[in-house]
UniProtKB/Swiss-Prot annotation:
GO terms for cellular component: extracellular region; fungal-type cell wall; side of membrane. Coiled coil: none annotated. Cell wall protein necessary for cell wall integrity. Plays only a minor role in hyphal morphogenesis and is not critical to biofilm formation. This is Cell wall protein PGA59. GO terms for biological process: amyloid fibril formation; cellular response to neutral pH; filamentous growth; filamentous growth of a population of unicellular organisms in response to neutral pH; fungal-type cell wall biogenesis; fungal-type cell wall organization. The gene is PGA59. It comes from Candida albicans (strain SC5314 / ATCC MYA-2876) (Yeast). Belongs to the HWP1 family. Its main location: secreted.
Amino acid sequence: MQFSSAIILSAVAGSALATYANSTVTDIATTVVTITSCEENKCHETEVTTGVTTVTEVETTYTTYCPLPTAKAPVASTSNSTTTPPVSTAEGAAAANAVPAVAAGLLALGAFM
């Protein structure tokens, strides 16, 4: 009798496991936030996408990112000319004028070597 009850329990447990199926429900959504900015008694609304939200039965994952600016950055002009900064003192002006003379003197010494 004990053996037959074990077979019946095994059959019931097997049929219960056979009807169970693993399933995962996934919901992927993008969150949009409305930002209201006010300046000088004027307000305007801007919609900003904050990221992607993935929801499963076990966990929720939030993916965020920094949005890229919509305006282009200014391009710096490339100039090949060199400028000398302004000199504010008389000693500075004398030193600025002396630099080419010293360089010329060193070049002259190099010619004799």
